[in-house]
């Protein structure tokens, strides 16, 4: 039987030990659940108007990923427990841009699909944006667990994109991600 260590903290600081490579490895295997301070959303041009901060970090270890530079000091994966507050803030942005459509990117700081079986945050986002008139949601992933998303009523307000590469690139540079065949099977399901 495998034991997963759980640590409860009052502080928001996550302290990783060792040299930089050790901290990176440890961080990639650390899941943090926290509350996101509701402040201004970051711009996400050109793919969307705003980032939708549901998750940060990624369990993948793609050697070329910009998250390695953006989140080098915080390589851990962080799930935000206050998604309803985040959606409410998104609604404020939608209202402020009416009558224009407002697009939110769910994967600017993470690959949230990898965590969907545990969080259901993408399901919540898809259902939320399905109810908005002028809000749209999009995300990209290398991961393949879309089963919980397939039957959702999305009202064509969500766009799911999958990142593809040949197996040689996936094996050499996209560590801890599904192979091409699984990604292609996922595209067929979508």
Predicted feature locations:
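A broadly conserved sequence feature marking short terminus-proximal activation segments
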Residues: 2-38
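Conserved Radical SAM active-site core
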Residues: 23, 32-44, 48, 63, ...
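Cysteine-centered iron-sulfur cluster-binding motifs in ferredoxin-type domains/subunits
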Residues: 52-62
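Short, conserved loop/turn and helix-capping segments at secondary-structure boundaries
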Residues: 80, 176-180
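Surface-exposed cleft-lining segments at the edges of enzyme active sites
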Residues: 110-114, 168-177
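Short, basic/glycine-rich phosphate-binding loops at helix/coil junctions
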Residues: 162-168
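Conserved C-terminal portion of the radical SAM core fold
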Residues: 181-190
